[in-house]
Amino acid sequence: MRDVTYPPIIVTAKAAFKVLGQRIHLAGTEHVPREGGVLLAFNHVSYLDFIYGGLAANPSGRLVRFMAKREIFDHAIGGPVMRSMYHIEVDRGEGVASFHTAVDYLQRGEAVGIFPEATISRAMELKEFKTGAMRIAAAAGVPVVPVILWGTQRMMTKDHPRDFSRGRTISLTVGEPLHPTGADPMAETATLHARMSQMLVEAVHAYPEDEQPPGSWWVPASMGGSAPTLEEAARLDGEEKRERARKRAENRAKRQGDK
């Protein structure tokens, strides 16, 4: 792929990280192969995860093609930029096309990024995973490399105001690769979830204590924080989903009434 947009965007992003005085802590990046198809599976706690997530493959000289929801590609400015970076558009109502695109990218030796939770976790811990990550990797015959992001949620996430205060730590922890066969996607997905859950616990405990006091809203309730529990987060997600459906129905009715 001929990358014209991606490299300068990376340079710009790194400059922004420096302006913000951020401390980027990378661990385990040797697990990202320098060549060949690889699927990177990320946890999802922030709207900025895909920006920072690519850093996991940076030491290996790789560019990550992220699978992202269609709405981002529908944006007048964001859409063309995303396409120029060869990211993969995902229609949550019809995911067959994105599945095949991801498999094609991987078989051509690309690094593809995916969020198995599909949406941001309000609980700050792992929600239930979709099986797509393991099915895609198995179909392409490539490894899945788990990656845990931590600290991005402090800047921009659901239900909280944006906060780009200086001097914060952002950590990315890369785990050893998994090699799905596709024989049992549910079991293989459960293995990925368990591996990443343990990595998340380790990432939270390794985060600087002075930046993460007890009761912090960005820390899971199960780890001493005040984020919603998984059950509370699921309820909020359900309410949000119903509200979006209501607004879509209203918009459809309005368009029909205008005809």
What are these regions (language model features)?
Residues 1-28, 75-85:
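A transmembrane-helix-recognition feature enriched in membrane-embedded lipid enzymes
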Residues 4-5, 96-259:
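Non-catalytic C-terminal accessory region of glycerolipid acyltransferases
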Residues 15-21, 89-93, 122-123:
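Short, flexible loop segments at the rims of nucleotide/cofactor-binding pockets, characterized by
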Residues 23-27, 93-99:
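Glycine-rich, highly charged phosphate/nucleotide-binding loops
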Residues 26-27, 88-91, 180:
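Short acidic-hydrophobic, aromatic-tinged amphipathic segments that line or gate anion-handling sites
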Residues 29-33:
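Glycine-rich helix-loop-beta junction characteristic of Rossmann-like nucleotide cofactor-binding loops
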Residues 34-94:
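Catalytic core of membrane glycerolipid acyltransferases/transacylases, capturing the structured
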